[in-house]
């Protein structure tokens, strides 16, 4: 849909004015005296150590909050006697579960009473 020449002129003027406003708001960043952007390396080693400590602490907190589930509806434990196996490199166990027979699950889902229809 093409606009009238007046509309085109208005939008061209608007674009020009808005573009000038954007240019006026731009600023250039310059390194201060004695600061060479190329000489600045990555994060300080102290910051790396802090971040590593934070990641490890949060990971341990998440492991502490994990719940061991002995049985879930529709699943049966397999594997070791208690149904648990330690994951390598962690302190928390990982449950080993296998789904039950799908027919048994569908039977349980459909076991609610069904409305009975009466024959005429």
Curated annotation (Swiss-Prot):
Renumbered residue ranges of the record's region Disordered: 16-120
Gene Ontology MF: a single term: guanyl-nucleotide exchange factor activity
Expression tissues: Cerebellum (Purkinje cells) and retinal bipolar neurons.
UniProt keyword annotations, A-Z: Phosphoprotein, Repeat
Domain of life the protein comes from: Eukaryota
InterPro entries, A to Z: GoLoco_motif, Pcp2, TPR-like_helical_dom_sf
Entry-linked SMART domains: GoLoco
Location of the GoLoco domain: 7-29, 47-69
Gene Ontology biological process terms from the UniProt entry: G protein-coupled opsin signaling pathway
Positions bearing Phosphoserine: 111
Keyword DNA-binding in record: no
Annotated Pfam families: GoLoco (PF02188)
4Fe-4S in keyword set: no
Record field: compositional bias (Polar residues): 108-120
Role noted for this protein: May function as a cell-type specific modulator for G protein-mediated cell signaling.
Name of this protein: Purkinje cell protein 2
Organism: Mus musculus
UniProt lineage: Eukaryota, Metazoa, Chordata, Craniata, Vertebrata
Primary gene name: Pcp2
